Amino acid sequence: MRLVQLSRHSIAFPSPEGALREPNGLLALGGDLSPARLLMAYQRGIFPWFSPGDPILWWSPDPRAVLWPEQFHLSRSMKRFHQRSPYRVTLNHAFGEVIEGCASDRDEGTWITSSIVRAYHQLHELGHAHSIEVWQENTLVGGMYGVAQGALFCGESMFSRAENASKTALLVFCQAFTQSGGKLIDCQVLNNHTASLGAVDIPRRDYLDYLSVLRGYRLPELFWVPRVLFPGAQ
């Protein structure tokens, strides 16, 4: 196994099975963040992740963290909170604000460079990247964004500026996604937060099998149209 240098003249990627074991999942470097290359990466179970000043690094870790949306872990305290939720949740109303919110989050944001922001803006404009927003009155207090692959959603990052805001984003999205035929959410690498919400590790080979099937599914035509997913507790 060796690290592959990508060409700027081809969007081809090596097989994810050739990724390094240490650091886990590092597959390639270089290339660019063009929409065509990013979409090719997601279709093959690969994603970019790098720090400012570093070359573009491409990853496909083993194991892979995933969440079956119908298995979202709703704790009793979160259930009580959601029943009285002060939040309104929307879809694709403020993609730019959400990715900027994720970029400014101290825990998650070091890797969301200006080039990443521009690249995912392009994917959003092309209808491939999507955001979920959590509002308290007219203030954005949390959200998440990711890339759609049929009935699989590749979650990229989330942020929270108020109690349970990011949990609310994921909970409401899981409910809407499941109801419309969504099957799986890619969480990339398991952490304490996503594990507490029901995410689990599966072998990379299994993830790639799910991806190859689910990316061929089609959600209802209007699923990604900007709309209100949750109006707040009534």
UniProtKB/Swiss-Prot annotation:
Q: Which InterPro entries match?
A: Acyl_CoA_acyltransferase, Leu/Phe-tRNA_Trfase, Leu/Phe-tRNA_Trfase_C, Leu/Phe-tRNA_Trfase_N
| Reaction equation(s) it catalyzes | N-terminal L-lysyl-[protein] + L-leucyl-tRNA(Leu) = N-terminal L-leucyl-L-lysyl-[protein] + tRNA(Leu) + H(+); N-terminal L-arginyl-[protein] + L-leucyl-tRNA(Leu) = N-terminal L-leucyl-L-arginyl-[protein] + tRNA(Leu) + H(+); L-phenylalanyl-tRNA(Phe) + an N-terminal L-alpha-aminoacyl-[protein] = an N-terminal L-phenylalanyl-L-alpha-aminoacyl-[protein] + tRNA(Phe)
A GO BP annotation:
protein catabolic process
Single GO MF annotation: leucyl-tRNA--protein transferase activity
Q: What is its EC number?
A: 2.3.2.6
Q: Which GO terms describe its cellular component?
A: cytoplasm
- SUPFAM superfamilies, from UniProt? Acyl-CoA N-acyltransferases (Nat)
Q: What class of enzyme is it?
A: transferase
Alphabetical UniProt keywords: Acyltransferase, Cytoplasm, Transferase
Primary location group: cytoplasm
User: Which NCBIfam families does the entry mention?
Assistant: aat
Q: Which PANTHER family match?
A: LEUCYL/PHENYLALANYL-TRNA--PROTEIN TRANSFERASE (PTHR30098), LEUCYL_PHENYLALANYL-TRNA--PROTEIN TRANSFERASE (PTHR30098:SF2)
HAMAP family according to UniProt: Leu_Phe_trans
What does it do?
Functions in the N-end rule pathway of protein degradation where it conjugates Leu, Phe and, less efficiently, Met from aminoacyl-tRNAs to the N-termini of proteins containing an N-terminal arginine or lysine.
Family, as annotated: Belongs to the L/F-transferase family.
What's the protein name?
Answer: Leucyl/phenylalanyl-tRNA--protein transferase
This protein's species is Klebsiella pneumoniae (strain 342)
